[in-house]
Design a protein with these regions (language model features):
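Alpha/propeptide regions of enzymes that mature by internal proteolysis
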Residues: 1-310
Length: 310
């Protein structure tokens, strides 16, 4: 975070900042060590946006390369495209000189094996995709309640946005996606306007949490558009969360009390440097990092709903 305040390209600083976490094998939300899909394969998504250049780059379903944000940045810098996916993303990363590796760590593999064991014990039809949707997600919540994993890492992601010393606005989002997802599933993180949106002279917004909910509303775009109309970052983020609550009607996504059984968090900054972190569910552990000329600090996200996930 402190690097992003240094006199260099702000987007490059953000990419290098999230790369530190992508390379940490103990981190199960991104990169090396990220939780795999239903078949035990780690597939990564990432996106970056550069406000002054009006450019963006993204990769989706990227396998065997830990630093997805760096690859997304190369897509932005070296191609005319915004998004490269699957085998094309793999071949592009290889051509750029990135090193292949097995991203599935012993920790992530152990969690996947336990999840798979429970799914197979309960599934009526192991070939039915709805098994992964219904039993699979419920078991992930069950494992989090048992303390086997952090519930927030079911949708683990990093979003980092910046306003540079000359007013440059940029952002990056990187993720290993929904834990135990259907192979090939792509969430909001690499999609412009969903997991990340930047508008120079206005602001930036990004998300972590259940990607399908932000995809449905293009929430990051909606937040930045609210900033353009004069909303404060906190108010813009809270309005986006309220829309997600209103649109969550699938019984499989509702708790016994009728509230969403997942979390979504938005991180918002405007051109003046005012920022906010908001979440469906909060608590002292639900925090976001802010770095200014006064140094870095952790702040608690403002929560829309009371209670906890599930």
């Amino acid at each position: 975070m402190t690097d992003a305040a240094a006199p260099r390209d702000p987007l490059e600083a953000l990419v290098e900042g999230v790369t530190i976490v992508e390379l940490d094998p103990a981190e199960t939300s991104v990169g090396r060590g990220g939780l795999p899909n239903a078949e035990g394969v780690v597939q990564l998504d990432a996106c970056c946006m550069d406000g002054p250049r009006r450019r963006a780059g993204a990769v989706a379903a990227l396998e065997r390369f830990a630093t997805a944000a760096r690859v997304a940045h190369r897509v932005m810098c070296d191609t005319p495209h915004h998004l490269v996916a699957g085998s094309g993303a793999h071949d592009f990363a290889l051509a750029c000189g990135f090193a292949e590796e097995d991203l599935l760590t012993p920790k992530a593999r152990g969690l996947w094996i336990e999840w798979r064991r429970r799914v197979e014990a309960r599934a009526e039809s192991k070939s039915d995709p709805s098994t992964i949707r219904d039993a699979g997600y419920a078991i992930g919540l069950e494992m989090s309640r048992e303390g086997l994993m952090d519930a927030n890492h079911l949708w683990g992601t990093i979003n980092c946005n910046a306003v540079g010393p000359r007013g440059e606005i940029c952002g990056v989002t990187t993720t290993s996606g929904l834990a135990w997802k259907m192979p090939g599933r792509i969430g909001d993180s690499p999609i412009l306007g969903a997991g990340l949106y930047v508008r120079q002279d206005v602001g930036a917004a990004g998300s972590t949490g259940r990607g399908e909910s932000t995809l449905y509303n293009l929430s990051s775009f909606a937040i930045v558009d609210a900033l353009r109309r004069g909303a404060h970052p906190r108010d813009a983020g809270m309005d986006a969360l309220r829309q997600i609550v209103a649109d969550t009607v699938d019984p499989a996504l509702l708790s016994e009390r009728g509230a969403p059984n997942f979390n979504v968090k938005f991180y918002v900054v405007n051109a003046a440097g005012e920022c906010a972190g908001v979440a469906l569910y909060g608590g002292d552990a639900v925090r976001y990092a802010v770095c200014t000329e006064n140094g870095p600090e952790l702040r608690v996200c403002d929560a829309l709903l009371e209670g906890t996930i599930g």
